[in-house]
Amino acid sequence: SSLLRLQAAAITDAGVREIFRETENRIRSMALVHEKLYRSTNLARIDIADYLRSLADLLYRSSAITPEKVAIDVTGGDIYLEIDDAVPCGLIVNELLSNALKHAFPDDRAGRIDIRLAERDDGAISLTVQDDGVGLPAGFRMEAAGTLGLQLIQGLVQQIDGTIDVRRRNNGTEFGVVFHRKRGANAAAAHPDR
């Protein structure tokens, strides 16, 4: 990501520079998963709430928005994901947070973004990203979204065999993702209690 930052510094077009910044954030979100794994006592899984808090801090540092202007709160504990789920989950949250920070709070508007994680009774993981910003435009449909970020979200949700649903609120927007943990090669190590 440092190479992208160096390259972006030489670009004069603000739109192209923004594309480089978004790409750098995507790379950093993946690198952060690996950093959390290497620092943990279990190399097969990470505490996803802890990871998402670190990701929020990373996005603050790469934007002009401060925690005092837009608060980000991550709730949900004791949910551990192996890398096959953690990377796509992190990229989904990276895109949703980036979009909210960029579009939900125009004109120096203050607000908050809540990220909630929960394990449902059926064992599925529920991930909700909700903001109290200006909301989505009338007629917005996720499946018709033309931006790279929203297309990436849809592809990542498919990758984890999940579903996504978008709800317009009186104040803001709520994205809900539901998926089941992977039961791949690392499943036994990642979930010894199951």
Identify what each model region corresponds to:
Residues 12, 21, 43-46, 64-95, ...:
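Conserved short strand/loop->alpha-helix "switch" segment adjacent to the catalytic nucleotide/phosphoryl-transfer site
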Residues 112, 135, 169-176:
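Glycine-rich nucleotide-binding loop
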Residues 1-28, 32-46, 50:
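Histidine phosphotransfer helical core of two-component systems
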